């Protein structure tokens, strides 16, 4: 097994991947080394500057006694867990892709800016792309073909079968099964609402449509991730109960105090969270440009030094955990 390509992805067809390995040994080139190092540093910043800092607050909220949390606390925890998961997993992929690039081996991209998705189906076309392609080829299409004469049944069973396997892929617990069932529900509703959604998209300007449906998609994914993150069904339903407890929506502080001082926690934790949130939002705004820059050789020495300084100064290494998707 090539060391940069682990079970968490990117997942390749053996025939296409083997063609690259046939040409070994690889000649090291300035471009491959430069782009590879930049990609590794980008992935390390995602993991150790953003994901690890977000994890401190996210873990605190998910592992906190739910009866003292407000709905706003739970809402932010769910959203930022989704952000943490993305930066953690895409950071791992960046490191894997960059490590392979050092030796001239091209691994497939596994993400295409999923937090810009305007629907759940688009989310899954942008998230863990190599795994979804594998599921589509070997599970979705065969089931859909089996029911090709009955379109509605084909949609229901192909989506249901795909996400049943996906749930088992991640774990055998009920929480993963419910996570999969929620996405089955999302995708079936979307599939049967295509005409209505297309009509809405035609009436709205593209930017307005994106401004409306990107947040909706993130909220829907974040809700499903309650089951993905919770350690038990009891915890998951406890979080959901607090999420919809409208009598305690805001924290027991004024919004200004809550925004500045937070609710409990040390000053170090509050700084970690705000710094991580700022870097995450900044990156997501300029994500497309950042990905182009790290694949550019021009002025690379300045970018490498800059990213290395960010990693050394702001990285969290002493309490860093494993990459989340290494657990699956």
Segments from the language model and where they lie:
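Substrate/cofactor-recognition hotspot
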Residues: 286
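Membrane-embedded transmembrane alpha-helical bundles that form the catalytic cores
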Residues: 1-281, 290-327
